[in-house]
Amino acid sequence: MADAVMSDAHLLGFNTRGTKRESDQQLHLGSSGASGAGVKRQRVEPEQQEPGNPMSMPVSQAYQGFAPLNSQGNQEPTATPDTMVQPFAAIPFPPPPQNGLSTDYGSQHTQDYATQSTEHGIPLYGGGQSLAEHSAPATSTANASSTTDGSQTEGQQSQSQNNENSETKASPKRLHVSNIPFRFRDPDLRQMFGQFGKILDVEIIFNERGSKGFGFVTFETSADADRAREKLHSTVVEGRKIEVNNATARVMTNKKSVTPYGNGWKLSPVVGAVYGPELYAVPGFPYPTAAAAATTAAAFRGAHLRGRGRTVYGAVRAVPPTAIPTYPGVLYQDGFYGTELYGGYAAYRYAQPATAATAATAAAAAAAAYSDGYGRVYTADPYHTLAPATSYGVGAVASLYRGGYSRFAPY
């Protein structure tokens, strides 16, 4: 009987190792010390005789999925391939954190291992094609993410450029308008430029004689300022072609202090000669000699010196100097102090008329003695109330405007 079972097993393709394993298993369950071959024959024969025994079905047959040979009284359902033990499936791990970004923007987690389907047989791992299939989506995902990042960067750059352009257009802009009619005032300039946009400020530059013929107009936006400049530049207004340009910031440069005097003095020659004659001695200046100075000082000793700074004037200053035209040219750098202004006055001071009265002559001598030689007389001078000489003319007035300081100047 056992030989028949073994022959049937060989015909059906059974592996005899399962039978041996099953007999070994049966051996451990409590059989006495019998040989392996005898136990195998002893256990196969009772299995066919006892169909109701739950241990009658061989383990190898149930594991391989085949029905037992003698299943006459077996009440258990036949095992199918669907009820086989499934191999280990990869657990889907959660995706890594994306630094606060939602999962929509993060790269999707791809399954690292392929699950074995029941249709395939023994192989638990996929071939090279499956690996390529899984690596291709990862590569495409990386390319897609890099493309998305590049597009986002380009979008941010374009948006920042648009913001800069809008800020530039929205910033105020100042225009310089020149050659405007002299009768124009701020309302006239505002009316002329107001048609192009909102104006923040209008300013026409004036001096003590009136309008200087140019001004500034500040628009709220640079776009309006550019449009006004294009429309109004080189247009003729009341016979004058006005010019409209972009106003530039005034550059404040630190100019080197160049002394206006040729001899390198730090102070004006007039101031230096008055308050410190011994410090500012000019070559060629007609100072008296020491003996003449001593004689003059002795003659004027005890006399009451009137005027400012009596302690400043020494024996040298007590002697009346010669006429101003004989002074060296280095002393006067401008017409304001030159003979253009004081030449006539000095001429009539030192050229007294011969027919003058004795009192007038004495007064003139006293005036010459007590004056400082620069037109300032500190005593009663009968000629002091006379009008200036004819040499005080247009040239002197022009030099006053050019060289002097005017409080009406806008700069």
Swiss-Prot record:
The gene is rbfox2. Residues 58-83, 99-119 have a biased composition (Polar residues). It comes from the Eukaryota. Residues 135-165 have a biased composition (Low complexity). This is RNA binding protein fox-1 homolog 2. GO terms for biological process: mRNA processing; nervous system development; regulation of alternative mRNA splicing, via spliceosome; RNA splicing. One of its GO terms (cellular component) is nucleus. Interacts with papd4/gld2. Residues 173-249 form the RRM domain. The record marks R174, F182, R183, N207, K212, F216, R240, R250 as: Interaction with RNA. RNA-binding protein that regulates alternative splicing events by binding to 5'-UGCAUGU-3' elements. Regulates alternative splicing of tissue-specific exons. It is found in: Nucleus; Cytoplasm.
